[in-house]
């Protein structure tokens, strides 16, 4: 093993000098002697000097310390030994439950499957959440993004999807916590434990308080574990919360690596870094990876380079809106902004497609009429428009739903609504079958039968 020494430390970025004939390759892992720190080579600067990112705190490191080249990329445990465990970016256990005891380790930098190896499918993945199943259905083996600003419910929606899909879906799941709150990681662990699905989930955390190196690589660590399950012929779920923090970690180290910033101060390699991660999240002929990613939207601006770059890679986008959340309608999914490639009559069938499009039409028309109502009042509308507004308000309330993971806060039991019941409920409202019911009856219920029951009590 060749060894070098530290010549410069700037925050999380460390320059190491090696003999000219033994310069480590890019992405090689280096170990600092006498410290537990791992470094990853990012650039070769010439004259035997390499620029690296530290996977951990750089406190206590100083110039002149010896560094050893491991001659390989960072590798992490993969396989069934990882299930039910919490690990960090390097695959070390952080749940105080002893060593992982893995049979195999894999490098976190791998090539994406070739075009010939990839496989696509049109099978729908039922989530039990009405608004998602209706207007932006998920594909099995697809990629889904949950977009939203701060505090509109990305993590709660993510937890509900995990609960509904991971419990109904008997396969394996991998959860990568990228730069999110440690408290949420803890809540998630206990949620999985209480639901008795912990033995099917591998958890990888690189939280907010960790150095940028950890947050930049933790998504790749989780993905490497998911790829192993996929290559063994399983259908895997990969949850990433939050993909924006992955971009942000790249931004933090980009300037230290000596790159010029691009738009809004992001790294110039933003699209490439996103592509490297997203292209690996794909289904092959062996098995599938269905990925659900939360995407933080800075200042609620969907045109910000980070969410805008993420859009290009997704099959379905679920947009959470602050305006809808302010009406008290949860999940605060915007049915007019959310889209899915699966929303096609050839994939989901005519009835589902027509119902979804009609719901969107009614809500869009209501949005247009709001200005007239605000100025002139309801009385100035034609009879047809009055009827449309009444139905739109019922649809808007019927799009809300009590969640299982929020039972503790709301006090009302969670509801799982099958796709069949969802379509039946909305098409009934559109046809006018429930025009006689008060709109409050549709708020925070599961299926349409519950709305009818609720109306009797009002």
Swiss-Prot record:
GO terms for cellular component: plasma membrane; proton-transporting ATP synthase complex. The keyword Transferase does not apply. It comes from the Bacteria. The keyword Lipid metabolism does not apply. It is a peripheral membrane protein. InterPro entries: AAA+_ATPase (IPR003593), ATP-synt_VA_C (IPR055190), ATP_synth_F1_bsu (IPR005722), ATPase_a/bsu_AS (IPR020003), ATPase_alpha/beta_chains (IPR050053), ATPase_F1/V1/A1_a/bsu_N (IPR004100), ATPase_F1/V1/A1_a/bsu_N_sf (IPR036121), ATPase_F1/V1/A1_a/bsu_nucl-bd (IPR000194). GO terms for molecular function: ATP binding; ATP hydrolysis activity; proton-transporting ATP synthase activity, rotational mechanism. PROSITE patterns: ATPASE_ALPHA_BETA. ATP binds at residues 148-155. It is found in: Cell inner membrane. Its main location: membrane. It catalyses: ATP + H2O + 4 H(+)(in) = ADP + phosphate + 5 H(+)(out). Its EC number is 7.1.2.2. Keywords: ATP synthesis, ATP-binding, Cell inner membrane, Cell membrane, CF(1), Hydrogen ion transport, Ion transport, Membrane, Nucleotide-binding, Translocase, Transport. Belongs to the ATPase alpha/beta chains family. Produces ATP from ADP in the presence of a proton gradient across the membrane. The catalytic sites are hosted primarily by the beta subunits. F-type ATPases have 2 components, CF(1) - the catalytic core - and CF(0) - the membrane proton channel. CF(1) has five subunits: alpha(3), beta(3), gamma(1), delta(1), epsilon(1). CF(0) has three main subunits: a(1), b(2) and c(9-12). The alpha and beta chains form an alternating ring which encloses part of the gamma chain. CF(1) is attached to CF(0) by a central stalk formed by the gamma and epsilon chains, while a peripheral stalk is formed by the delta and b chains. This is ATP synthase subunit beta. The gene is atpD.
